[in-house]
């Protein structure tokens, strides 16, 4: 959703932004599914020095995306445990 919104803010039409986002997600998931490479290896394979992916990854790192993912996943896991207990009572 955020990727599509930003794409539109950068001047893409809604249709093109949606298609780019869905194709990016589909391509990444298919690569991960069929490859024997680790996620880190796949990232290295698609990251051209000085390219757009490298720039985006650098921004993610600088802005603390890893910490955001860790907090979000931990929070969701904790909520799943709470819900499991609620349903088992």
Model-derived segments and spans:
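Anionic-ligand binding region
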Residues: 1-19
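NAD(P)-dependent Rossmann-like dehydrogenase/reductase catalytic/cofactor-binding core
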Residues: 18, 22-89
């Amino acid at each position: 959703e955020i990727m599509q919104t930003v794409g539109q803010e950068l001047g893409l039409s809604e249709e093109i932004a949606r298609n780019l986002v869905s194709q990016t997600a589909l391509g990444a998931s298919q690569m991960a599914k069929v490859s024997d490479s680790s996620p880190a290896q796949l990232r290295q394979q698609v990251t051209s020095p000085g390219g757009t992916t490298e720039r985006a990854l650098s921004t993610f790192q600088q802005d603390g995306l890893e910490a955001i993912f860790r907090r979000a996943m931990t929070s969701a896991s904790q909520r799943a445990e709470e819900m499991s207990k609620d349903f088992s009572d």
